[in-house]
Amino acid sequence: DDFSKRIIEPAVAVLVSNIESSMFDSVTKEVYNHVGTPGTLPTILEIAQAKAKLNQYLAPKDDNRCIQMESVDMAGEVNALKGLFHDSKEISKQYRDGVVGRTMGLKWVENERIYTHTVGGDVAVAINDTPAEGDSNLTIDAASAAAAVGDIFTIAGVKAVHPETKVAYSHEQQFVISAATTTLLTFTPSLEASGANQNIDHLPSDNDVITMVGTASTAYPNHLVYHKNAFAFATADLEMPQGVHFAAREQYDGLSIRLVRQYDINNDNIPCRLDILHGYKALRPEWACRVMGSGS
């Protein structure tokens, strides 16, 4: 028991924390929806607008919606919400733990491992291309520096549409960079102006202006509002080796962790190793929305 508490439990905590951090880094950069003003504490209205984004892209309206937010901005939200109506259970949690309870149809989670995004180069460039249906690459006028993977942008006048009715929304469709040079942007979702996968009201044109979210070379914590089915995380049971001093495998809360211990005759010690075989992916990135906060 003492060995487990002193050695195993701290090691597992670090391992799981690193996995969670890498997952947020990866899946957040696949999310193209964004609301709010980067660098400022998100307002309650902006959180509601993030929730509205999920509604507009047909995320289920159930109890599986969540917001992950780092501690500094969470403290600001607790202060902003303190005078508003909550039931007694949520008020006691807010007072006792200093966190926001379930409100606005979202479960609020304080998390220091959310992704912090640093915006890339120029935040406004022009298309130097004739975009076609299905394109996920755009040639642009030479920028002074390349955009960063995870940068979000809009194209002037290109509106998003309802996924089913295809009626144009009032806001411009947002896209996220998956690769970039100073003259080429690769992004998702692709440009679809017709058919079942239509996501924009019309194709952009040469010289249309592309505008990035945020200020160049500036880092912002990316709070994440999402439905749980937006992302997938999976672990698999690793094979149990034979002929070792000790081997064990445990499953807890969706994680499968293997511990192997073996005597090292050369160094006269018994090293242990912990392994988790895991993977993650944004399956429905439209069911999530980034809110770039201040973190200060």
Describe the function of each predicted region:
Residues 1-40, 46, 55-73, 96-110, ...:
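Long, contiguous amphipathic alpha-helices that act as assembly "spine/axial" helices in icosahedral shell
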Residues 83-120, 202-204, 208-296:
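Protruding loop/beta-arch "assembly-hinge" segments enriched in small, turn-prone residues
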Residues 76-198, 203, 290-291, 296:
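Autoprocessing Asn-cyclization modules and mimics
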Residues 10, 49, 80:
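Alpha-helical scaffold segments in soluble metabolic enzymes
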Residues 44-52, 134:
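Active-site glycine-rich loop that binds ribose-phosphate moieties when present
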Residues 26-28, 166, 288:
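Sparse recognition of residues in long alpha-helices and their boundaries
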Residues 1, 139-143, 259-266:
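Exposed beta-sheet edge/beta-hairpin loop segments within beta-rich domains
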Residues 66-68, 152-154, 174, 271-275, ...:
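Ordered hydrophobic segments in well-structured contexts
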